[in-house]
């Protein structure tokens, strides 16, 4: 029987070092993420963002960036002004477009409201009402020259137009036998004898606005022929935006005609009639085929708390699902590349991808039920996805990480609060306003925090690359801040215990190294001071600059060693060359690289008789 043995700790390496992974250098935080693919993905996106930011800064000057940022802010403020104006004019004040038919519209029939520009027919007339039923509506204007035959022709045209829109599924399912073949003798009129074509030849244009209101939901689902056969009275009210005063002033009409449309105006007008009825009734949009039901809803001030909770749930759920789907797609792409490179079999992650797709579809369905619109739900998911990508890829400084999400939730909550408080009225315009302010916050944080940090890092890299190369007379000993890995200040060198320098030093007037010798350490100090001056927001930038500093200094060090090795066969005093660095030199021949060679030995020696200019000649 075998026992479970714990794995042994990694043994020492061949040089006495540990065989395990090397500890993290400097201020780097340990990697707590066990999945290396996430690190690869983050590094890839960070590199792409870095390159795009540098290219953007080179193509567009700061003046253009400020102008573009101001333009986005101005656009957001303009849309906010339009929303506030429309809300005050049309939502706060009652809309009385149907006030003249409040007392005489048929409660046992259908009220049909149409918006037509420069219409030539009567503003109010009846359809599908016999001569006896006309007496029930005294004072009602009758369309001049309208007899039964012309009315039938008009209804035939209306029938063709109605069945051309998306509401065809309701009429065909409810009344499948309304249209009889022409040979049938049971047909009542010409409109029923006309066969319905398989493919509709005419659809509603986008500028048509027609709604129908009735207290009975079944009346709205009947076809035009059935309404005429059953003599269901239909009152048609035509509204002309150029003549009716209920559409506001000239600026309001311009906004309604060019940007908003008349759907909300029609629904608000019908809602004014429904508030006076005990049974609120039902509404049908003839053009889109959507059905609505009027209910009594009282939104208190506490509804904002419910809107905030719903916003948090929807946003976090969509963000989690989108991040999971991105990870699964990235893993599949990496596996596919490995298969093409190494000719190895992979397993397609069908179950995770199918799970996340079904979850996204279910989330969109839930959001569509809440917003009563699939388009609004889709655009909200798209906005959350863009914000999630911006936070994961573009936010690196601590200021952006701390404050940008607050602005996003603030603007996003403004849309949820407006939609929940006013029951979805002008919700599309509110969503556009929220997105424009979110877009401005993205551009602002990128211009004022992320881009300066990236440009500062580029300047540090250019300063390191433009440093003078190490010459033969430059000391190749590592600076104190490079040798001292612990971060403690370096102590004064001991003349008895310090290892010899790798090359001669050109002393200055006071016995200290020349200005050339201080070039590498001053360069590193300058880079560190620049990074420290930028504050705590540039921690990741200082770390990258330190890595580049180490690499460039060590490469210059190795190059100088290779250049100086054949040029100095003898020591400074004409003797044998120094021992290698890893061998221990005699204590009486050790000298500090900051002390003149003549002062290193107490008594007279043959080395002291050498000319004092010998070290400089050899070094040069």
Curated annotation (Swiss-Prot):
It is a multi-pass membrane protein. Glycans are attached at residue 189. Pfam families: Membralin. GO terms for biological process: positive regulation of ERAD pathway; response to endoplasmic reticulum stress. The keyword Translocase does not apply. InterPro entries: Membralin (IPR019144). The modification N-acetylserine is found at residue 2. Keywords: Acetylation, Endoplasmic reticulum, Glycoprotein, Membrane, Phosphoprotein, Transmembrane, Transmembrane helix. One of its GO terms (cellular component) is endoplasmic reticulum membrane. Its main location: endoplasmic reticulum. Signal peptide: none annotated. Residues 1-33, 474-517, 568-620 are annotated as: Disordered. The modification Phosphothreonine is found at residue 29. The chain crosses the membrane at residues 70-90, 302-322, 346-366, 426-446. It comes from the Eukaryota. Residues 22-31, 499-517, 568-593 have a biased composition (Low complexity). It is found in: Endoplasmic reticulum membrane. Belongs to the membralin family. May have a role in the ERAD pathway required for clearance of misfolded proteins in the endoplasmic reticulum (ER). Promotes survival of motor neurons, probably by protecting against ER stress. PANTHER family: MEMBRALIN (PTHR21650:SF4), MEMBRALIN/KINETOCHORE PROTEIN NUF2 (PTHR21650). Interacts with ERLIN2. This is Membralin. It comes from Homo sapiens (Human).
